[in-house]
A protein has these predicted regions:
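N-terminal periplasmic/intermembrane-space "pro-region" immediately following the signal or transit peptide
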Residues: 6-7, 13, 19-68, 74-77, ...
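Outer-membrane beta-barrel pore domains
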Residues: 23-35, 73, 91-92, 137-140, ...
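Detector for intrinsically disordered, low-structure N-terminal pre-sequences
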Residues: 6, 10, 15, 281-282, ...
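N-terminal secretory signal peptides that target proteins for export/translocation
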Residues: 1-3
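Hydrophobic alpha-helical membrane context
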Residues: 14-15, 211, 415
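Short, polar loop/linker segments at the starts of domains and inter-domain junctions
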Residues: 75-85
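Outer membrane beta-barrel
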Residues: 51-72, 87, 92-223, 229-263, ...
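Short glycine/proline-rich turn/loop motifs
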Residues: 84-87, 294
């Protein structure tokens, strides 16, 4: 699926297939999360049977998102000669204009009772001009493919996932924009430290009476290969939590997650988003390449080992929502070093949804990340961000949002491009998802 031709052929094939596999307005598969507004504030899939199995069903979905960027940036870094008389710390000039339109193609297939497949392809993304597969997995909620009713009492509480997939570390990744899939993100940008990666692995879930437990593992690699023996070991992850609808107006959720890898040539947890940041070219020098995709976010660049812990409280009281994040990450400077350093991230957002169907919302988010740079003896630096957003769901599948963002970089060395750096301004985004 590396070429547009192959993707178009794939779309055509499954579109024809879906004409036969789908009937009526029901596009919901068993034990799945809706891609539109109905999936707001949904984290892991539940054990509630959202639809009845009637045979093979193919759902062709997707999303498309476009932003207008009106940001400016500044710094006070010292002049650093690139060898040709140019200052590598001079920031590139920005203009108010549109970013690249992004698009996803989703293929979801109900293969058997309680057995479904998900595949997502990035058709257009900031980091890759060509279409490529982001991830795919098989989810098992029933074992009827072994024999009808096999271990139903167990599978009433258990879910299994296996694939080259987005790992379930923390709750923040459920509310982030995944390339063009941005309906469930109240804001335009994701976190400063964007904890997201896709790795080959498996996860087992226990869900009962509001309790959630998950254990999983992955091979610790974003890019798969078989020619680097011993350089990366298995990564392990887990999650414990409680999610309860206390009464019709009040929902409470609290989870804690861990991801750990004791031997990795490269750590991908904070660099795994190949789609790219929403804030194009901010705090980048005049020599920066146009395909740079990480501007506006921060990768601590751990190597060799990592243990990351994330705690997420969530509260919804009628139209008022609070979602919080505390993250502590401790990792190695390099694969050959025993030194470790730590980064902490805090985030809190308050959203108020209103209107007959809560189609309008306003919200604010504060996000801060702080820690040591590559030298474990270096001084701690801090990055702070404030986001204010207002949004309108025109329909369940279309949202328009506008965001004010201000991000500052503190305590960086005078010779760093991030010295007293700041970017701020307005972002406007329109998104479609189905």
């Amino acid at each position: 699926m590396k070429t547009l031709t192959s993707v178009l052929l794939l779309v055509s094939f499954f579109f024809v297939s879906s004409l036969f596999a789908q009937t009526g307005p029901d596009r919901q598969l068993q034990y799945s999360k809706p891609a539109d507004k109905h999936g707001l504030n949904m984290f892991e899939t539940t054990k509630e049977e959202t639809s009845e199995f009637v045979g093979l069903k193919v759902i062709l979905g997707g999303s498309s998102t476009l932003q207008f960027q009106g940001l400016n940036h500044s710094n006070s870094a010292l002049f650093v000669d690139d060898g040709n008389g140019a200052n590598i710390n001079e920031l590139i000039e920005l203009e108010n204009n549109f970013n690249l339109a992004t698009a996803n193609l989703d293929l979801d297939v109900q293969l058997h009772n309680g057995l479904r497949m998900h595949l997502r392809t990035y058709l257009s993304s900031r980091h890759h001009p060509e279409p490529y597969v982001k991830s795919g997995y098989l989810q098992v909620d029933r074992l009827d493919f072994v024999s009808p009713g096999f271990l139903d009492n167990v599978m009433d509480m258990v879910t299994l996932k296996v694939g080259h997939m987005e790992i379930n570390y923390g709750d923040a990744h459920f509310r982030r924009s995944d390339n063009s899939a941005s309906l469930h993100n109240p804001f335009v940008g994701n976190y400063i430290m964007d904890s997201f990666t896709t790795e080959v692995g498996a996860e087992a879930y226990l869900k009962t009476n509001g309790f959630l437990g998950m254990l999983g593992f992955s091979n610790g690699k974003l890019n798969q290969d078989v020619t680097s023996p011993g350089e990366t070991s298995l990564a392990f992850l887990g999650k414990l939590g409680f999610d309860k609808q206390v009464n019709p107006g009040l929902r409470l959720r609290l989870t804690g997650s861990i991801y750990t890898n004791g031997n990795a040539k490269q750590i991908y947890l904070y660099s795994g988003d190949r789609a790219g940041s929403r804030y194009y070219s901010v705090i980048k020098g005049i020599t920066a390449t146009r395909d740079n995709f990480s501007s506006g976010r921060w990768n601590p660049n751990f190597s060799g080992k990592l243990t990351a812990i994330m705690i997420n409280p969530f509260l919804k009281w009628n139209g008022l929502e609070f979602f919080g994040t505390y993250e502590n990450s401790s990792g190695g400077d390099s694969i050959n070093s025993n030194d470790t350093r730590t980064w902490n991230q805090l985030a809190g957002e308050v959203i108020y949804r209103f209107g007959a169907s809560e189609q309008w919302y306003g919200g604010a988010r504060f996000n801060s990340a702080s820690g040591k740079l590559a030298n474990a003896d270096a001084e701690k630096v801090t990055i702070n961000r404030v986001q204010l957003a207002f949004g309108w769901f025109l329909t369940d599948k279309v949202v328009a949002k506008i965001e004010y963002v201000s991000q500052s970089y503190n305590d960086f060395a005078a010779g760093s491009i991030y010295s007293d750096a700041n970017f701020k301004g307005i972002m406007a985004e329109a998104a479609i998802g189905f």
